[in-house]
Regions:
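N-terminal and secondary-structure boundary signal
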Residues: 1-251
Length: 251
């Protein structure tokens, strides 16, 4: 069996042409037949809350723009969505993060996972609700942010899948799984259920977060952009580069 490939690019800043070149190289790992066959792509950023890009809490819009342009050049219908946390409304989050401007510029279909319907799946007796949008697109691009996390130590690609869970349900899962181990087990179950729906994952680590992440830490310039079709390999590699050992990350 071939080992999964993790791509790493050293990128100093949010320069669109440079990131476009990296993204195009990353997507060479997607089978050309799949890109040709699928007409609709879902791009799922990290939209944790209403934070401006310089706060380094959410995926930088320039990284997302590079991905959007790649698929628009191939005449794909692009869906763009997430289920933000916190008390701010979806529109406020989308506007503050710089995502609304992208959606308007490129005429994207914006999906609020909290209101657009969900499916209830089951993993070994554990019911988990996820957005229906995940099952309505042939290509799904998962775009996380490179950060520390107070509960899970590290957040990258796998933790970003939690955004497929509708907003109020996310709050309920935090109540049901309040400690590190139970929450990590829930994340692993979520990955087991939907991981095969994710075509490719990218982690925006050009500027990430250190300290008390995922939202209260300090922006830190790492100058890295990661990509892989394998979420476990991607997170393992990115976490090790950040300085974590395997035992430090509970999932």
């Amino acid at each position: 069996m071939n080992r999964p490939v993790v791509e790493i690019r050293k990128i100093d800043g949010y320069d669109l042409p440079v990131i476009e070149e990296a993204v195009a190289d990353f997507f060479l790992k997607i089978k050309s037949q799949k890109i040709t066959r699928c007409k609709r792509v879902l791009i799922k950023p990290n939209a944790l809350g209403a934070y401006s890009p310089e706060k380094a809490v959410t995926t930088h819009p320039i990284v997302l723009e590079a991905i959007i342009r790649y698929f628009q050049d191939r005449n794909k219908e692009i869906w763009f969505g997430d289920s933000p946390g916190g008390s701010m409304g979806f529109e406020t989050v989308w506007q503050t993060c710089g995502f609304a401007a992208l959606a308007e510029k490129y005429h994207l279909k914006v999906i609020n996972f909290s209101t657009a319907g969900f499916k209830e799946l089951n993993y070994k007796g554990l019911p988990i609700k996820v957005s229906e949008a995940l099952f309505q697109c042939g290509l799904v691009i998962n775009v996380g942010k490179y950060k520390t996390h107070q509960l899970t130590a590290f957040t990258g690609a796998l933790k970003n899948l939690f955004g497929f869970v509708p907003g109020l349900v996310k709050s309920e899962y935090h109540r049901l799984y309040p400690d590190t181990n139970s929450f990590a087990n829930m994340l692993v179950s979520l990955y087991a259920l939907i991981g095969n729906r994710i075509t490719y994952s990218i982690i925006d680590g050009i500027t990430g977060m250190d300290g008390t992440g995922p939202s209260a830490g300090k922006p830190h310039h790492f100058g890295l952009l990661f990509g892989s079709p394998s979420i476990p390999a991607l997170d393992y590699t990115a976490a090790r580069i950040m300085g974590f050992q395997l035992k430090d990350v509970p999932y």
